[in-house]
Amino acid sequence: MIQHMTRLKVADNTGAKEVGVIKVLGGSKKRYASVGDIVVVSVKKATPAGLIAKGQMAKAVIVRTKKSIRRESGLLIRFDENACVLIKEDKTPRGSRIFGPVAREIRDRGYTKIASLAPEVL
């Protein structure tokens, strides 16, 4: 469960390494984000020669969470970390590579470009 002030790892090559959640988008008082949800983030740590600088704001989609995801088959999936991918306004990834596995719910929510760039879809 991702909420306001949660720190996330960035799983792409935009240059941002860690971000903090400012707002969970969707609904008037939506508190928690799960895999596939969009959040507004602020870059907390970044590499010097990246597309994104420290302090910049961006939108991101959650790709991995420590909180388990329950599927219709009864299967529970959880990851070792909370991670996101920075996206543009048209919901395409800002980076050209994605690191680590992503949940299948990403593809189901319509982020096919992120799912195709990921090395593994669980």
Swiss-Prot record:
Mind telling me which SMART domains this protein's record contains? Ribosomal_L14
Q: Among its keywords, does the record have Metal-binding? A: no
Q: Which UniProt keywords apply?
A: Ribonucleoprotein, Ribosomal protein, RNA-binding, rRNA-binding
Q: Which InterPro entries match?
A: Ribosomal_uL14, Ribosomal_uL14_bac-type, Ribosomal_uL14_CS, Ribosomal_uL14_sf
UniProt keyword annotation of Acyltransferase present: no
Gene3D superfamilies on file: Ribosomal protein L14
Q: What is this protein called?
A: Large ribosomal subunit protein uL14
Question: Would you identify the family this protein belongs to, as annotated?
Answer: Belongs to the universal ribosomal protein uL14 family.
One Gene Ontology term of the biological-process aspect is: translation
Recorded GO CC terms: cytosolic large ribosomal subunit
Q: How does this protein assemble?
A: Part of the 50S ribosomal subunit. Forms a cluster with proteins L3 and L19. In the 70S ribosome, L14 and L19 interact and together make contacts with the 16S rRNA in bridges B5 and B8.
GO MF annotation, one: large ribosomal subunit rRNA binding
Explain the purpose of this protein.
Binds to 23S rRNA. Forms part of two intersubunit bridges in the 70S ribosome.
Q: Which CDD domains match?
A: Ribosomal_uL14 (cd00337)
Q: What is the lineage of its organism?
A: Bacteria, Bacillati, Mycoplasmatota, Mycoplasmoidales, Mycoplasmoidaceae
